[in-house]
């Protein structure tokens, strides 16, 4: 049965209480990957995958999920500033649908508006060279996306 693809808050219901999550920032040329600890408090960078064919990309993501015994994915959804979905969001949803056919791990979609811009500002503020930024931007964006999702889930748990 294909994995569920839901907004983050709805997907969280289908994840066990503990277990790592993988955060993904889909770019046209790369996929930034981050992972949480099993308690879902901290996101750390894993790697930047140079995109090839979907099957190769998916195989690498599923291998990373297995290595970390991840129980789900958090996929950054690039919404427009007005909240609408443009071509990049549609492409991300298509990627999620294709990935869902290969795994049963639920996929949570999380608004990633301005994540890359925020990460780029932070890297510039830390004097990271343009060449180095280009190599790490997607992985850092994945960390930003996943940490935002983890913080939101933690806030919801505290409010219960």
From Swiss-Prot:
Which keywords accompany this UniProt record?
Answer: Cytoplasm, Hydrolase, Nuclease, Ribosome biogenesis
Task: Give the family, as the similarity comment puts it.
Answer: Belongs to the YqgF nuclease family.
- Protein source organism: Rhodopseudomonas palustris (strain TIE-1)
Name its cellular compartments: Cytoplasm
- Which EC number(s) does UniProt give? 3.1.-.-
Establish whether keyword Nuclease is in the entry: yes
Q: What is the protein named? A: Putative pre-16S rRNA nuclease
Q: Which GO terms describe its biological process?
A: rRNA 5'-end processing
Its predominant location is: cytoplasm
Purpose of the protein: Could be a nuclease involved in processing of the 5'-end of pre-16S rRNA.
